[in-house]
Amino acid sequence: MLRISSSLLLASLLVAVTSASASENYSPYADVDHPTNVYWGDTHVHSSWSPDAGGSGNEKLTPIDAFRFAKGEPIVAHNGQTVRLRRPLDFLLVSDHSEYLGLYPMLEEGYPALLATETGQRWKQLVEEGRRSRVGGEFAASLSSGRDLVGDRSFVPHVWKQVVANAERMNEPGIFTAFIGYEWTSMPGTANLHRNVLFRDGADLTRELVPFSAVESQDPEALWAFLADYEARTGGRVLAIPHNSNMSAGRMFETTRFDGSPQTPDYAERRMRFERVVEATQIKGDSEATTATSPDDEFADFENWDAYAGMGVIGPHEDWMYGGEYVRPALGRGLELRQALGVNPFAFGLIGSTDAHTSLATADDVDFWGKFSSNEPYAGRDQDPFAQLEMPEDATFDFSVAARELPDQLYTASLVSSGYAAVWAHENTRASLFDAMARRETYATTGPRMVVRFFGGWGYEAEDATRPDLARVGYEGGVPMGGELGAGPEGLSPRFLISALRDPEGANLDRAQIVKQWLDPESSAVLERIYDVAVSDGRTIDGDGRARKVVGSSVDVKRARYTNTIGEDALITWWADPDFDAATPAVYYVRVLEIPTPRWTTYDAVKFETKRPQNVPASVQQRAYTSPIWYTPGG
């Protein structure tokens, strides 16, 4: 009989335990490699270095001031009051216009090449006369034609080096990310085709480039070519972020190329290489959805800006334009184009940002500082034009002080206190945040900082929504927002996990919805349906997936207050598509709605004891839009 001593047995057991411990960590978090933090920021803020900002009252707040404000430091605004964010942001892109970048500092400095031009001399004289608004007006008017007003713009590379130096100075990896970039301001015939250019890289790669502007070309393909050349030369990475599609006169998401020719697979691939996310909400209106294309959506038409075609009042808006202006119909068009081209040119994620030209990234109804510094808080600001520019006589459009008979859309009351970009990233660095945007793990909010998760997969179960480690379950069993699902097990429909937590300093939540679009299997037309997947206050979701009972309102308009006596702190749920067809491409995204809260104009009316404007709502339901998840048969 074989005998084993007790000491030998104990030793062998210790070895076994040690071996097991070495191969399997005790800590359940040791191997976690998915993003656990959401970072908040703004990829669209202008300083006094942008000609239109400097021409509309922002004479002194520089890019450095913009970064300081985003970091939570107090700043003295042009009206002499101190302003400070309720909570700091995690990242910022100061996206001053590349067209005549740093014009006013260069005029004040007396940059020789600029003052050697006739226009430069005239502009310097206007600035000395206190007529910056005229210079800003000429800049704004020139954008519709792309005409070069100066001829010699050699001052731009000089200013760009300062732009890069400013971002490098304010960048604090792990604490605050200062992105390097600018805005490319294409506006043919006043159709807004603007893109914000955001670099992953630092000064070592970006310092020597000369920003591409719409003076060189108004065609987005020319911008992409410039960005492709940058990446090829440097090994760096860069994104172009479209914004204000709602003011593009149907051109931002048109089904043709800029020159009117048909889209090609190569075009779609180049677009998706650089345009990974779209700015879906900002001060000049929300671009998520319109009842013109989604007539059954009672929550569409939120703060829309589409009364006229393009940026200027050059003509009435036409119905055909809507499909190329709003995010939701664009996502549907993307499904159609993928069928035709094999590539989806509109497979973009979503973010929000402000487009503030004040250097102040404010997206808060109770502390709204306007689009331009001329809109800084004062009694009756809602009754004044939002852009107080002196337009040239030959301008093709006018939203100036002189044009007092303006449509409602061009008065300050119509401005929207929106929005911010939420990014699920591993850490607060340029590289990590950029990579998250590139993989579309982002969402847009109209200002509140609600925390939203969205996962899609084939194996989630209803009880997964109750798991404390919902995010880990989501990543291990599927894809996050911005991801793509291929064919699943036969007979199964995709399942989704949705988690929405209210802003801890904001309003309760009304509901979480899934918006689905798919191609009709017979006609290939885009179909759409909205499902209420989680609602507050014990309301019932009917058999068609909709909750008909509204959440109500706790808003006291006379005092500009609300209470969290309705709604929920959190909405967390599991949902399986009840109408799924495995043969049909589809796209899904989540929309989260808060309970009603006072609009900024209501707060202003109470603070300044003025009459509240009647052409805008007294209260609004702030919201979040996630990046979509796509399903592709056989993908």
Q: What does each model-found stretch correspond to?
A:
Residues M1-I4:
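Positively charged n-region of N-terminal signal peptides that target proteins for export
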Residues S7-V17:
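Bacterial N-terminal signal peptides
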Residues A22-P63, F67-A70, A77-A116, D152, ...:
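C-terminal functional module detector
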Residues A113-R147:
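Aromatic- and acidic-residue-enriched carbohydrate-binding clefts of CAZyme catalytic domains
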Residues K124-Q125, R131-V135, K161-A165, T177-F179:
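Mid-domain alpha/beta scaffold segments of enzyme catalytic cores
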Residues L198-R200:
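Long, charge-dense tracts
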Residues A203, S213-Q218, A300:
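Conserved, charged catalytic cores of large soluble enzymes
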Residues P211, A222:
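Acidic, metal/ion-coordinating pockets
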